[in-house]
Amino acid sequence: MVRSGKNGDLHLKQIAYYKRTGEYHSTTLPSERSGIRRAAKKFVFKEKKLFYVGKDRKQNRLVIVSEEEKKKVLRECHENDSGAHHGISRTLTLVESNYYWTSVTNDVKQWVYACQHCQVAKNTVIVAPKQHLLKVENPWSLVTVDLMGPFHTSNRSHVYAIIMTDLFTKWIVILPLCDVSASEVSKAIINIFFLYGPPQKIIMDQRDEFIQQINIELYRLFGIKQIVISHTSGTVNPTESTPNTIKAFLSKHCADHPNNWDDHLSAVSFAFNVTHLEPTKNTPYFQMFSRNPYMPETSDSLHEVDGDNTSMFAKILDAIKEADKIMENKTTSLGQMENNNLDELNKSKIIVKKKPKQLNPFHLKVGHEVLRQRKNWWKDGRFQSEWVGPCVIDYITESGCAVLRDNTGVRLKRPIKMSHLKPYIRESSEQESLYLLQGSVVADHDYIGLPEIPIGAYQANILVEDATIGIVDNELLTSSKDRELLEYRNTKISPLIDDHSSLEKQTFSLLDSSNQVLEYLS
């Protein structure tokens, strides 16, 4: 440790002098000698150089003292061989792995903060170039190309198929391929150009090297540059290029006709274009040509060829219609299942209604005696509470908190929440003295009862809610037991009622009235 205000370089020089000579440097104070001896245990001399080895003596860090050597070390550790600059954490790690001085952390921070290259790079924001999304507004302006296969080798040596789909009309064109080389794919695309003309852009989900080879072939064969772009270039919205229906049907059809599947690709694409309904409720054929194709009114000409034999196109057409129905039913059933699952999930949810918080569960009022909750602690698997008091409610604030007074009449400093209060129930001896000393004030304590009076006496009093205290209709008390309870009750309460008026007029303290209380009780 270096004492506060001492130069760190001087501290290292004193340690080096002590390790080299075994004596203290002339600048070492007597109070610093014990610290120098303890610190010297973490250093060793090797080849006339001082190294820091630490307490475990496993480190081997060269001690740097001069300012020029520090700057050289910081420059080497901050900049790497490629010219990039490290941050504070990486630079500090590189410095501390081989070098040591007392202020290494602060020096690294100041060096990085003062680096002009780092400050310029920190404030430079690299803005990505804006990508202009291609809008699909016209037929055959933006198309996608998908490659499918390998299938069973046909009689004409075809193994793959290329599917070109117009994103605006969903018009598809399918051609067979012998392989998926750039030259073979480019020739198939050129043949489609000769039928419908070249689009503005062609989107392919292939690697960039393959797309570049196709662009070179298209420029050589057709003279058009950079017409094919990658699907991941972000120039179009991520939409499904080829419908799943045609992909699934084509895979099944090629498996069912392994030898001549390539002869039926034109029929498959035409059947799909005249039957598949888009969200606009129009077929791709109508979207492409603004008219419907001429189709025979009856299917006899299609289904009756050479007697009972059915034409291949009719089979393909019926199969595609059936595939569309299956896909539509599957989509509908999936939607219904999702809705049913959501309904079941909503029904299974247990709606837990939170019990409203009772701000004043005991209906406490001004003048009531209460106990206040001082603290809670966890014990035996539940919260335990400590209640102190009694206190009297002085008044209730607008926020629903109670201001209390203690037994001596001193008001408490902080208001207490009503939920942290509960009624104070006095013992029998305390209640009798309370009745005698407080007079009519006891009438406000509607929750304070007489524990020494049996429960039946309260039941008799509840039957007549509007009657005066101590007066009960005798007709309601039919049994002898009730009469006994009434008499017992009257003997307890009637003396208080008789002297009620006189007690109200008298104002005396507890000390002055002690003799009168003893005389009254006797």
Curated annotation (Swiss-Prot):
PROSITE patterns: INTEGRASE (PS50994). Widely expressed. Also found in tumors originating from parathyroid gland, colon, stomach, bladder, uterus and prostate. Residues 135-292 form the Integrase catalytic domain. GO terms for molecular function: nucleic acid binding. The keyword Electron transport does not apply. The modification Phosphoserine is found at residue 502. Gene3D superfamilies: 1.10.340.70, Ribonuclease H-like superfamily/Ribonuclease H. It holds the Pfam family Integrase_H2C2. It comes from the Eukaryota. SUPFAM superfamilies: Ribonuclease H-like (SSF53098). Keywords: Phosphoprotein. PANTHER family: PROTEIN CBG26694, PROTEIN NYNRIN-LIKE. This is Gypsy retrotransposon integrase-like protein 1. It comes from Homo sapiens. The lineage of its organism: Eukaryota, Metazoa, Chordata, Craniata, Vertebrata.
